[in-house]
């Protein structure tokens, strides 16, 4: 899908096309998995694969409807990626779900005897490779998994793929901001055309002068 073809989608997407492009949503890696091929439309001259923005938009709609059906207190969002910590916290604060940031300890979702055991009916991960422990345990327990998947992501035990750049600060911020908006609209927490009470910029991870990510 060329840029000219993408421009024809204006008015059909949840947000203006420019917002998706500015956030780098479609920028993948130089590797691809056969499972992600249906979501890839081309490759740049530098070898980076590009994801289909229309399919990303479609999957966000599906994910929002799926999330809205679940009790938010039993919905866990996992992010081992530092750049995902802030957007996940913001998303969970608005939606009412549980953030799980950093490394997931073995048995978190499978062993009720552990002090850190967490019961979940639905899980979302920012990267199925980085968050593999959580995804594997979700598969064992029959917990549906929504995953942000890049061009080279593994999809074992993933029930719903959202194709996106899952490494960039702006991309992660936009995905969680948009998903929060759609969930709240579907649940009736904000009007059908309402906006979130916080701006997109609040979802983006920040790098301090010390190098710390917050």
From Swiss-Prot:
Keyword Hydrolase listed: no
Keyword terms: Ribonucleoprotein, Ribosomal protein
Single annotated GO MF: structural constituent of ribosome
Gene3D superfamilies registered for this protein in UniProt: Glucose-6-phosphate isomerase like protein, domain 1
GO biological process, one term: translation
Homology family: Belongs to the universal ribosomal protein uS2 family.
UniProt protein name: Small ribosomal subunit protein uS2
Protein source organism: Thermofilum pendens (strain DSM 2475 / Hrk 5)
The organism's taxonomic lineage, starting at the top: Archaea, Thermoproteota, Thermoprotei, Thermofilales, Thermofilaceae
